[in-house]
C-alpha cells in the first residue's frame, strides 16, 4: 500500500531545495495585545524544524 502524506503536517512544514524543513513560529496568531512587540518581532518569519523532530516529519511528509 502506498504511504500517504500527512496533510496537517504538509500544510505547516515546507521542504527547502536542499532538503531542510522550515516551519512558522508559534505564539503569533492571536492574543497579541498582551505580548511585548519585541517578542512578536522575534517570532516573525520561519525557523528550522529541530533535529530531534526531523526524521518523524520527513516520514509524515513522505520524504523519508
Swiss-Prot record:
Gene3D superfamilies: 4.10.410.60. One of its GO terms (molecular function) is structural constituent of ribosome. GO terms for biological process: translation. Keywords: Ribonucleoprotein, Ribosomal protein. Residues 1-20 are annotated as: Disordered. The keyword Ribosomal protein applies. Disulfide bonds: none annotated. It holds the Pfam family Ribosomal_L35p. GO terms for cellular component: cytosolic large ribosomal subunit. Belongs to the bacterial ribosomal protein bL35 family. NCBIfam families: rpmI_bact. HAMAP family: Ribosomal_bL35. This is Large ribosomal subunit protein bL35. The gene is rpmI.
